[in-house]
């Protein structure tokens, strides 16, 4: 099975399954000398872990990360950083009824047809359980980017089902289980989710992620454009079905006179492009939005087939998120950090001493 590594100079490789013994991560390409302990990685893991509210999966995992290599006396050595997170609350018996059947909307059928074998327990490798290790690896990138470049990455829930969150108060983002910026919307979200859970159904969500203090020049045209790699990393997240950069699909209704971002010596007048021109960062905020589908793990019956092609009816048991988007914010932040960290390393390798007579334009007026 290939495809478990992302990045060129700053890379992460993950291994492990939903009901396996542990999740493993290898981070390669981190510069030496970065102060790093498990404490630096745990906060984001705690934000992602299940069982923290009635609105998420009731699987209780502590998600305690341990650094196995790549540090000495509390600092990175420049060698590969190995991480491990133990799985402690597997309940594999919940999945015995789907051993020889395929859950519609899941990777059961495609994994089986591709590999001829699949770990049916909790989805195996295709489970979002794997993203816990991405969050741990992304924590290394987030710390380096903030320390060396003051780059800050922050995300929030902008829509859950029909409920849109439009007011922005960043002090609220970690005060509720939804990563919602509007305190007045929290009770509305809770009521909606309570009704949804009782119905046995699920719902999709939209997450917005913003990168502040971006330098100019990150991105490797043509095929490794920054926005192309961002889309790649975002689409690798379970359940993501859409990615927007800047105004995204709204550009369809815009005229060129509306969309172009005027440049002045005091700053850009707008940021419709989302901080990227020609695949290269402009120094403005990077604006990313992702759409996550509703989970297919439902207690409501649906038609499917078994391994031999016989017709069956599937009812999914187990512990599942009625809205996977609720816990997706730390995952999206981590993947964006990993992508930007890789491009920082690549830009530094090729263009470290490049000088220009053109002044750096402030991000915005």
UniProtKB/Swiss-Prot annotation:
| Note on cofactor | Reduced FMN (FMNH(2)).
Biological process terms from the Gene Ontology for this record are:
amino acid biosynthetic process; aromatic amino acid family biosynthetic process; chorismate biosynthetic process
Binding sites annotated in the UniProt record for NADP(+) = 48, 54
Names of required cofactors: FMNH2
Give EC number(s), comma-separated: 4.2.3.5
Which reaction equations make up its catalytic activity?
5-O-(1-carboxyvinyl)-3-phosphoshikimate = chorismate + phosphate
Where in this chain does the entry annotate a coiled-coil region?
none
Alphabetized NCBIfam families for the sequence? aroC, PRK05382.1
Name of the protein: Chorismate synthase
Origin organism is Vesicomyosocius okutanii subsp. Calyptogena okutanii (strain HA)
């Amino acid at each position: 099975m290939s495809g478990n590594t992302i990045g060129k100079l700053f890379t992460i490789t993950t291994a492990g399954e939903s009901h396996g013994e542990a999740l493993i991560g290898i981070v390669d390409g981190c510069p030496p000398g970065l102060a790093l302990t498990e404490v630096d990685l745990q906060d984001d893991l705690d934000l992602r872990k299940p069982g923290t509210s009635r609105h998420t999966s009731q699987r209780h995992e502590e998600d305690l990360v341990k650094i196995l290599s790549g540090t000495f006396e509390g600092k990175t050595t420049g060698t590969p950083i190995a991480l491990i997170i133990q799985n402690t609350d597997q309940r594999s018996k919940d999945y015995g009824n789907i051993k020889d059947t395929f859950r519609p909307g899941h990777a059961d059928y495609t994994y089986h047809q591709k590999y001829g074998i699949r770990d049916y327990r909790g989805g195996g490798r295709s489970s979002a359980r794997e993203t816990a290790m991405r969050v741990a690896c992304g924590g290394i990138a987030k710390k380096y980017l903030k320390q060396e470049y003051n780059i800050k990455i922050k995300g929030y829930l902008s829509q859950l089902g029909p409920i849109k969150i439009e007011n922005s108060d960043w002090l609220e983002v970690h005060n509720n289980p939804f990563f919602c910026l509007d305190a007045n919307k929290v009770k509305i979200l809770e009521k909606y989710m309570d009704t949804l859970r009782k119905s046995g159904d699920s719902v999709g969500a939209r997450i917005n992620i913003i990168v502040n203090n971006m330098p100019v020049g990150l991105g490797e045209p043509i095929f490794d454009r920054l926005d192309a790699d961002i889309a790649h990393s975002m689409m690798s997240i379970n359940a993501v079905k859409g990615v927007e950069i800047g105004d995204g699909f709204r550009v369809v209704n815009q005229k060129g006179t509306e969309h172009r971002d005027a440049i002045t010596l005091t700053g850009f007048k707008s940021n419709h492009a989302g901080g990227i021109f020609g695949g290269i960062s402009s120094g403005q905020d990077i604006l990313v939005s992702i759409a996550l589908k509703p989970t297919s793990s439902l207690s409501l019956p649906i038609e499917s087939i078994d391994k031999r092609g016989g017709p069956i009816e599937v009812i999914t048991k187990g512990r599942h998120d009625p809205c996977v988007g609720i816990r997706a914010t730390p995952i999206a932040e981590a993947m964006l950090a990993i992508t930007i960290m890789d491009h920082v390393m690549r830009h530094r390798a090729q263009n470290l001493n490049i000088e220009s007579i053109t002044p750096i334009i402030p991000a915005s007026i």
